[in-house]
């Protein structure tokens, strides 16, 4: 029986919400598609996310009330499967999880309630060793001792790893419908979970970003989290090598490392670390920049390049993952993809780069294919189809 979307009860379940990034924008897009949905998560940081989520009611698990759950969040990963299985969803018509970790572990406890998982990626700390954020005790929050690190590493990266992988695999099999956020993740889901997934690209607020058709300023931009896996060090090294100006917008665990890298170079003030910037400030930087540098390795999708193209700005990105699906290198040309993950390779492109080779209108048109309104339409149509056929 077909149900009107206005009448259905929807639960949206997210991984812990404690920062503002691409995953949180994706979550907001789902909430825009289903404005009356109830939002669940294991735990959240109200102050850290208030800019985007305001005073919205968020239902939480027992983890929210455990002391130090924010500062020791790596260790509380071990509790999250139970946290998500503790929720009761019997009053809902459909449950939508958005997961990169454990949100999909939930149980609807009813064969009449379909579970749709928007999978941003299978957990990389289980399945992709090289992409683990925590590679040693020095990466932990200051004050956490090596004993705690060894405890964490034993349970996640040690002899129990196969058990966690099996548990994760089984959780994925319980999901009724899977949505991947890119073809890259779709292939990963097939390889790891042996499941088919439909692709719905994440929402990007293209309509809120003004395009700049005028001449660009003579500096490059890196915008995003300052993490090794995002390649911020690669961007900085390449700009130091070519002696070109770079503005770095964002914060993360690599900040001190990047500061030291700049300090030890002959950058002569050309590398500017701006720290956290608001969306409005970020969009302004994008409109003025010569190009966005996006050297992220194994990127699942990548919202930032779409935002840059919406501003009419071309993108220089690593040829892997999401950017290969979103950036066009010909007819029309909206960016350049480099194939060797090496700062010298990136430096070669920066030396020859000319923003006049790119039409801002073409960049904008490319970005419009990923606008939030398209995502909202596709998500509503998908859930409506699920409820009609479940």
Predicted segments — roles?
Residues 297:
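Aromatic "clamp/platform" in nucleotide-sugar-dependent glycosyltransferases that forms part
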Residues 355-384:
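A charged, aromatic-enriched C-terminal amphipathic alpha-helix characteristic of glycosyltransferases
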Residues 204, 210-230, 236-247:
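Conserved donor-binding/catalytic core segment of Leloir-type glycosyltransferases
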Residues 256-280:
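Nucleotide-activated donor-binding/catalytic signature segment of Leloir-type glycosyltransferases, i.e.
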Residues 314-317:
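Short hydrophobic beta-strand element within catalytic cores of glycosyltransferases
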Residues 123, 139-178, 186:
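Membrane-proximal helix-turn-helix segments that form the acceptor-binding/catalytic region
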Residues 276-277, 284-289, 379:
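Short alpha-helical donor nucleotide-sugar binding micro-motif in glycosyltransferases
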């Amino acid at each position: 029986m077909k149900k009107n979307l206005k009448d259905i009860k929807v639960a949206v379940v997210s991984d812990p919400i404690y920062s503002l990034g691409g995953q949180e924008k994706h979550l907001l897009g789902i909430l825009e598609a289903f404005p009356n949905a109830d939002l669940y998560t294991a735990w959240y940081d109200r102050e850290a996310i208030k800019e985007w989520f305001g005073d919205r009611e968020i239902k939480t698990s027992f983890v929210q009330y455990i002391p130090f759950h924010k500062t020791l969040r790596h260790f509380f990963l071990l509790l999250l499967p139970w946290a998500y299985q503790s929720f009761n969803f019997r009053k809902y018509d459909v449950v939508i999880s958005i997961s990169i970790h454990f949100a999909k572990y939930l149980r609807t406890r009813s064969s009449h309630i379909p579970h749709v998982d928007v999978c941003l990626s299978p957990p990389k700390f289980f399945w992709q060793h090289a992409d683990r954020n925590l590679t040693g005790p020095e990466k932990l929050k200051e004050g956490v001792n090596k004993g705690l690190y060894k405890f964490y590493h034993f349970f996640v990266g040690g002899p129990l790893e196969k058990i966690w992988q099996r548990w994760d695999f089984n959780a994925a099999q319980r999901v009724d419908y899977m949505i991947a956020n890119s073809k890259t993740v779709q292939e990963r889901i097939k390889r790891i979970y042996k499941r088919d997934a439909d692709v719905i690209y994440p929402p990007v607020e293209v309509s809120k970003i003004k395009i700049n058709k005028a001449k660009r300023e003579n500096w490059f931009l890196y915008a995003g989290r300052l993490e090794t896996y995002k390649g911020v060090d690669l961007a900085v090294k390449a700009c130091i090598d070519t002696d070109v100006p770079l503005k770095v917008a964002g914060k993360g665990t690599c900040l001190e490392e990047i500061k030291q890298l700049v300090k030890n170079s002959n950058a002569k003030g050309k590398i500017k670390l701006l720290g956290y910037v608001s969306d409005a400030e970020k969009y302004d930087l994008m409109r003025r920049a010569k190009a966005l540098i996006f050297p992220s390795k194994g990127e699942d999708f990548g919202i930032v390049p779409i935002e840059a193209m919406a501003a009419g700005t071309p993108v220089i990105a690593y040829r892997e993952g999401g950017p290969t699906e979103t950036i066009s290198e010909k007819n029309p040309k909206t960016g350049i993809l480099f194939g060797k993950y090496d700062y010298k390779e990136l430096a070669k492109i920066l030396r020859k780069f000319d923003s006049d080779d790119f039409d801002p209108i073409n960049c904008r048109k490319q970005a419009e294919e990923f606008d939030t309104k398209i995502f909202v339409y596709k998500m509503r149509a998908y859930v409506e189809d699920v409820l009609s056929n479940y």
